[in-house]
Amino acid sequence: MTDKFLEVDYLVIGGGAMSAAFIDALLDRDRSATIAIIERRDRLGGHWNNAYPFVRLHQPAAFYGVNSIQLGKGGADLSALPEIQEYYHKVTKRFEKSGQVSFYGGHEYLGDNKIAPIADPENITTFKVNKRLVNGTYMAVEIPSVHPPKFEVADDIPFMPLNDLITQYDKWEQFYVLGCGKTGMDAVLFLLRNGVAGEKIHWVMPNDSWCLDRDYLQVGRIMGTVLEHSDAIIKNDKAHKVFEQLERVGGIIRIDKAVAPTKWKCATVSPEEMAELEAVQNRIRKGRIKRLTRDGIEFADETIAFPQAALFVNCTADALAAKTPTPIFSERRIDLQSVFFCQQVFGAAAIAGLETSKCTDKMRNWIKPVPHPDIPSDWPSMLTTTLDNALKLHAFLPLWMMRSRLFYMSHDPIHVYLANAVKAFVIAGRVRRAAKKFPRTI
């Protein structure tokens, strides 16, 4: 066993998008801090290094990535995988150029400030951490290409992750897409756009979800969307009524108006994409799969046969799980979490802003985590916490908020920005009181 000892101000576990956003913001506000990044992969970018080839951002590139480097062409642009991977290469170069950041790719964090190369686990390095350990893995993203199914699959079943679909879509007669989250939607859209007829696609949907309409999450429109959602929470006392009102006024959509969704995961699609998805009528709603064999797809109460020449596409990873929140700041530790609904990278950058502000951890923890939602009744408390956090962050970091490209309001003209800030202040208390009508699950 080899022991080495190094000293660093911040030891960051994980090199994904949230860690990158945190480090980028920290570098802008602390020109002397030293940072070590510990990452199992060889590159920054986290799950983007394992993403399926045809993936695109689900929300505008204008407010994704890190504060210091623009991504995409602005506006409604949705960057594709090659551009995103090149972007994180640029981020890496920025970190290297600073002279403040050391990247330990291909390393495992062992706990107790110790790391070791995955290829040489006996070669241990121990860090003296002067300020904080930063946990960039708390959100525990499940990556579709490497996440095994939660059910038994017989060895003779043609079963593959979504990543392989690009080489297999023209070799099979029938397709079974397993999973109805955003990954499952992307799989169905890929097949349809590559000439596979809708009747050849069988979509196993354990549940239906409400989705965000991407048209309402564009630069200049998001705050209006937040206010519409706030109004719906104030006016209704049941979660399904909130979403039905939002569906009527615009901003929330679902694949089948005859089915009441039981899930809400922040999946973002356009009305045009939703119209394409509606072309797939072979929707199997039998709950979760228990077992997949040549005898059929086994559910709790029924087994369904399938054709011999059928390919099964695994889209069952819970990419954005509803994690139990924990205080962001604790003694000598930071757990990176969202502080705005469905906006992880902004949250990480804002946490760096708080870390470098002149206040106590008790004050910093006035900013509460906003966990990813799972069911519709999670939404009122999520939106309430988002509004409260926005107001508190403006008190802590007013100029930083206005200048942060990751904060969606920063793209608005100053008079619109200020007007929306006033509206948020006026409505926040009413939303907070109204949210108490809804049960909380997270």
Residues of each region from the PLM?
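Feature captures the FAD/FMN-dependent oxidoreductase FAD-binding
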Residues: Q70, G74-P144, C266, E273-A300
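C-terminal active-site-capping segments
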Residues: T386-I442
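Extended alpha-helical coiled-coil/bundle linker/stalk regions that scaffold oligomerization
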Residues: T293, E298, T303-K358
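Glycine-rich active-site loop/strand segments that organize a redox cofactor
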Residues: R40-K90, L162, V204-T262
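Glycine-rich dinucleotide-binding loop and its adjacent helix/turn
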Residues: G74, A80-Y87, N135-G195, I201, ...
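Rossmann-like dinucleotide/flavin-binding elements
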Residues: S19-D28, D164-L212, F346-L399
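N-terminal low-complexity, Ser/Thr- and acidic-residue-enriched intrinsically disordered segments
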Residues: T2-V55, D412-P413, A421-V422, V426-G429, ...
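Short hydrophobic core segments
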Residues: L11-I13, T126-E142, Y176-L178, P307-D318
